[in-house]
Amino acid sequence: MSTRNPAQSHWGVPKGQRTELYVYNTLTHSKVPFVSNGSNLTWYCCGPTVYDASHMGHARNYVTTDILRRILQSYFGYNITFVQNVTDIDDKIILRARQQYLFEEYKKQQGTNKSHSEAREKVTEAWFAYAKKNLPEPPSSMSEWPQWLASHDIPTLAINNPKLPMHVDALKSALDALQVSEASEIISLDGFWPKVQDVLVPLLDAELGSTVTDPAIFRKLAAYWEDDFNKDMANLNVLPPTAVTRVSEYVPEIVDFVQRIIDRGYAYPVTDGSVYFDTEAFEKGGHFYAKLEPWNKGNRELIAEGEGSLAALTGKKRPGDFALWKASKPGEPSWDSPWSKGRPGWHIECSVMASALLGSNIDIHSGGIDLAFPHHDNELAQSEAYFDCPQWVNYFFHAGHLHIEGQKMSKSLKNFITIKEILKKFTPRQLRLAFLLQQWNTQLDFKETLLAYVLNIEQALENFFRTVRALMNETEGVSANGGHVPEKFDKLEIELLEKFQQTQQNTHLALCDSFNTPLVMQHIDNLVTQANIYIREVGQQPCSRLLGQIASWITSMLQIFGLDENGHPNAVGWSSSKGSSSENTDAMPYIRAVSSFRDRVRELCIAKASSQEILKACDIFRDYDMAALGVSFNDRPQGSALVKLVDAEELIAAREQKLEEERAKQAKKAQAKAEQEKKQVERVMKGKTSPSEMFKMFKEYLSFDEAGLPTKMRGEDGSEIDVPKSRKKKLQKEYAQQEKLHKEYLSYIESNKS
């Protein structure tokens, strides 16, 4: 395994004026002073390889790059020429386009075969070929599949073979489709083909891939996913590039670029018509290879991955050499060149396109950290060989990896979340906030605790903006009506002003420290907390002028970070996540609501209604009419209510929640009352029998006095005897208790007659 022992190359500080800004530069793996030649910057960003949907890893990379670009442009004031490429010639695109085409053609062909026996045979053949290629000790028959699964610990094997679970799932899916189709003797197009696609397309490609010759097949796939990528970036509020370079439009320039490297002695053609970069000759010529990650210089796995899955690799002088031009085989798109009909290597594409627009020295080059070696290291080598210069790029910005709940994302493992999927759960602003809260060049773990923190910060900022807007509107109303608005800064105002000034200074220092946005957001959060404390402590008339300046500055910083695509200068707060402001400027709905309220109050007064009825009408106006318009009235202990403009759906949801809580409270109260009444009835019914009759139902008593108390009873021998004194005393006590209960019973009956 590679280590980081090899020393990195010397990095030269660019010529120009030093500033306060220090940036993390992957060329040194440290923070270095940012030096530019004037106010103009050139920036090349590695764009997408367009063969599939963009995922969260892309979001982290491109939104993070966008944040850095916005800071340099809008905070530090640089004019940036931002060039981003589209890789539309690549082995992944060739394979995906070819396999999709062959799969669709095969489905059409089989659509005329009613028995589909040929399709089952082909999928069965593909199943065994796929298992043989991708499984350790594959089963020799499909009947052995359950035994194979039981005897192999997939999670443990996946530690050294991460793609194994994906292959197992593909085989499971295809086998299930085969078994279902055999049982029913028919093939359901919806159920069969999607399940067998992953195992079938490699076999179709191996047998028929060389027959695919139409260039439009490859371009169609790339064009579709390029458009899809652009839509995702627009949805994420990523600024468009100054220029987009598409590889297919720069092939002649690439051929010329490769020829010049050959002429300088840093590349060599081989017998199959491919051209390779000579890393040994490059270093002997006084250059340094693998500036970014020298410890990976001999990492054959990364080198092979960078060459692509269709690379022939014949005729290379040494393993570390890489392709500048690939001779195309049948079934691969090709262009003319002095060496062969072929296509560009992956790494040369970016070198040529960046140099074509930005020249022999570029201020900033950016991309994901996974591209550092070999892609970016090879870019540097090619360009420095072409220009024979020591430093083609001054600063390399690499966005850190993205993990999901601690797990690495990978397209090949099919465990990635697409941008469209994540935007169904979170807004673009919330995603950007999540990226802002993590230092741009470090690993980000996208997990529930981070998202909960993001939602809390977003809500805290929104509540602060609403309160400040409400206080500013209130002050404007007082002034408009000729009222007095105090402007004096007392102790609390001075303390808040000092906190504001310190936050501005701390924010500047944090941004100068390699764009430390997590620290900036912490400073902003602390300032909001301090401002809220001030509002509570100062009482009825907080200084809306100072609060407005604080809120406006915070808003401007959030706009710089790209958190408000519809923001405008001097705004207080961001627009809603749906793209429209919650402060509706159309006055008619409000006028109509006030007019209707006036009519109701007028009718109540004419009818000489009670004050309670009028207050009820006021509550309806507040909780229903105005809530539907996004207006909140917050009653205060003294004076007028504080008026806020809030999203109507939020107010309605809060009202319904409050009503639901009240209904639950009343239901609980009613249940308690019913239980109490039940107990009362049970007690009352015990007194239904008159005390004068209560003992006459017992046969042991033979005679009674006028009140109904027993005087005679049967003795043990059956003879008549006087009631003993001890018994008489007990009976008198029971009589008194029943007399009390009977009175309660009679009273209850009387009271419930109505």
Swiss-Prot record:
<dbReference type="GO" id="GO:0005737">
    <property type="term" value="C:cytoplasm"/>
</dbReference>
<dbReference type="GO" id="GO:0005829">
    <property type="term" value="C:cytosol"/>
</dbReference>
<feature type="compositionally biased region" description="Basic and acidic residues">
    <location>
        <begin position="672"/>
        <end position="685"/>
    </location>
</feature>
<keyword id="KW-0648">Protein biosynthesis</keyword>
<feature type="binding site">
    <location>
        <position position="411"/>
    </location>
    <ligand>
        <name>ATP</name>
    </ligand>
</feature>
<keyword id="KW-0067">ATP-binding</keyword>
<dbReference type="GO" id="GO:0002181">
    <property type="term" value="P:cytoplasmic translation"/>
</dbReference>
<keyword id="KW-0479">Metal-binding</keyword>
<feature type="region of interest" description="Disordered">
    <location>
        <begin position="709"/>
        <end position="736"/>
    </location>
</feature>
<feature type="short sequence motif" description="'HIGH' region">
    <location>
        <begin position="48"/>
        <end position="58"/>
    </location>
</feature>
<dbReference type="InterPro" id="IPR009080">
    <property type="entry name" value="tRNAsynth_Ia_anticodon-bd"/>
</dbReference>
<keyword id="KW-0030">Aminoacyl-tRNA synthetase</keyword>
<feature type="binding site">
    <location>
        <position position="379"/>
    </location>
    <ligand>
        <name>Zn(2+)</name>
    </ligand>
</feature>
<dbReference type="GO" id="GO:0046872">
    <property type="term" value="F:metal ion binding"/>
</dbReference>
<keyword id="KW-0547">Nucleotide-binding</keyword>
<feature type="binding site">
    <location>
        <position position="350"/>
    </location>
    <ligand>
        <name>Zn(2+)</name>
    </ligand>
</feature>
<dbReference type="InterPro" id="IPR032678">
    <property type="entry name" value="tRNA-synt_1_cat_dom"/>
</dbReference>
<dbReference type="Pfam" id="PF01406">
    <property type="entry name" value="tRNA-synt_1e"/>
</dbReference>
<keyword id="KW-0436">Ligase</keyword>
<feature type="binding site">
    <location>
        <position position="375"/>
    </location>
    <ligand>
        <name>Zn(2+)</name>
    </ligand>
</feature>
<feature type="region of interest" description="Disordered">
    <location>
        <begin position="664"/>
        <end position="686"/>
    </location>
</feature>
<dbReference type="InterPro" id="IPR024909">
    <property type="entry name" value="Cys-tRNA/MSH_ligase"/>
</dbReference>
<keyword id="KW-0862">Zinc</keyword>
<protein>
    <recommendedName>
        <fullName>Probable cysteine--tRNA ligase</fullName>
        <ecNumber>6.1.1.16</ecNumber>
    </recommendedName>
</protein>
<dbReference type="InterPro" id="IPR015803">
    <property type="entry name" value="Cys-tRNA-ligase"/>
</dbReference>
<feature type="short sequence motif" description="'KMSKS' region">
    <location>
        <begin position="408"/>
        <end position="412"/>
    </location>
</feature>
<dbReference type="GO" id="GO:0005524">
    <property type="term" value="F:ATP binding"/>
</dbReference>
<feature type="compositionally biased region" description="Basic and acidic residues">
    <location>
        <begin position="713"/>
        <end position="725"/>
    </location>
</feature>
<dbReference type="InterPro" id="IPR014729">
    <property type="entry name" value="Rossmann-like_a/b/a_fold"/>
</dbReference>
<dbReference type="GO" id="GO:0006423">
    <property type="term" value="P:cysteinyl-tRNA aminoacylation"/>
</dbReference>
<dbReference type="GO" id="GO:0004817">
    <property type="term" value="F:cysteine-tRNA ligase activity"/>
</dbReference>
<comment type="similarity">
    <text>Belongs to the class-I aminoacyl-tRNA synthetase family.</text>
</comment>
<feature type="binding site">
    <location>
        <position position="46"/>
    </location>
    <ligand>
        <name>Zn(2+)</name>
    </ligand>
</feature>
